[in-house]
């Protein structure tokens, strides 16, 4: 038993723990623009034995229309869209960058596979956990705007079970 504890100690120490949402640190001002950095692929942790490469991540950047950015920002202020659990697996994350007066005010990282969600204001972590409900729906919709409702349901069935 004692050996098992010391064997698991490095994994416990390196694991990221959930952090409750700190609404006092969430940016409250006006937004100028919202950028989306959509990443797809796999990491060393999520690759499979016959994978052509150990790790492959592709990145596509686009600007989200301001109306959609404001709608997403309003959803972020809802206390019911956060789940204070952290997934065991780290996956490729896409980023949503919120700007005001040309400065980055809020950075949000989201994984479609695990619903992992981390939010930063500058370098300060303000939330680490998972998304749920309408936040998950909107994030997936903004990352995959060309998919129909049926395709979204088929591709993200596991994600939609709780919604």
PLM region spans:
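Function-determining sites in protein domains
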Residues: 16-163
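Bacterial Sec-dependent N-terminal signal peptides
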Residues: 1-21
């Amino acid at each position: 038993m004692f050996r098992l504890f010391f064997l698991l100690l490095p994994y416990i120490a390196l694991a990221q723990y959930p952090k409750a949402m700190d609404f006092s640190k969430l940016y409250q001002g006006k937004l100028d623009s919202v950028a989306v950095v959509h990443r797809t692929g796999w990491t060393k942790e999520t690759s499979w034995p016959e994978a052509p490469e150990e790790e492959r991540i592709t990145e596509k950047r686009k600007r989200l229309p301001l109306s959609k950015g404001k709608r997403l920002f309003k959803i972020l202020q809802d206390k019911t869209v956060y789940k204070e659990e952290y997934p065991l697996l780290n996956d490729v994350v896409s980023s949503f960058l919120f700007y005001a007066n040309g400065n980055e005010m809020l950075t949000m990282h989201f994984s479609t596979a695990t619903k992992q969600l981390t939010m930063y204001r500058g370098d300060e972590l303000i939330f680490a956990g998972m998304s749920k409900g309408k936040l998950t729906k909107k994030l997936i919709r903004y990352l995959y705007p060309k998919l129909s409702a049926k395709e979204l349901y088929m591709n993200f069935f596991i994600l939609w079970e709780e919604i």
